[in-house]
């Protein structure tokens, strides 16, 4: 079992933007698989992108307070997650895409072990691991790694996630479909396995 005092992960904005990915990642953090970290800028990016998605919909006026409530709940649930003193850029990250360097520096400030992001190509993964000892992981790979640590606790986390989805409730099939659509294919495959699915 990982110690949350040692295993710290920065969640990039793109991993917090899709609802089901955010919910799974935060549920696993709540079940103490790892310690999540983010910055004000990361918060601003995912909330802005989510607001843009609702901009052309009739629910746009209702979206802003809901998004703000989610952000507030995240900071309240994980009071140590917000990294307030992000370090200035260093020469060790020149190969990282300019728009993502703040994520790396958040990880450095947080002494994080990993960054979870869908934008793997924008991070110089080998360089970060060699020079800063920070891994860059796709959310699906990261979640599967957590599952492999303790499958029983992972199943409990997914059961907890489903139990909180009441308006409307999520069926097992809907959860699996949402995971696949969000790019969590390996995670969905594990949940769909013959020995796990009946317990979900």
Task: Please tell me what each predicted stretch does.
Residues 8-11, 19-56:
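PIN/NYN-family metal-dependent endoribonuclease catalytic core
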Residues 33, 79-80, 133:
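A generic structural signal for alpha->beta connector loops
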Residues 79-114, 165-169, 177-200:
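Active-site neighborhoods of divalent-metal-dependent phosphate/nucleic-acid chemistry enzymes
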Residues 121-200:
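Acidic, PIN/NYN-like endoribonuclease modules and their adjacent C-terminal/linker elements
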Residues 100-135:
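Acidic, metal-binding active-site segment of PIN/NYN-like and related structure-specific nucleases
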Residues 37-83, 161-180:
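PIN-domain endoribonuclease scaffold, especially VapC-family toxins
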Residues 1-6, 196-200:
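Intrinsically disordered, low-complexity and often Lys/Arg-enriched segments
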Residues 11-13, 117-118:
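Short His-Asn-centered micro-motif
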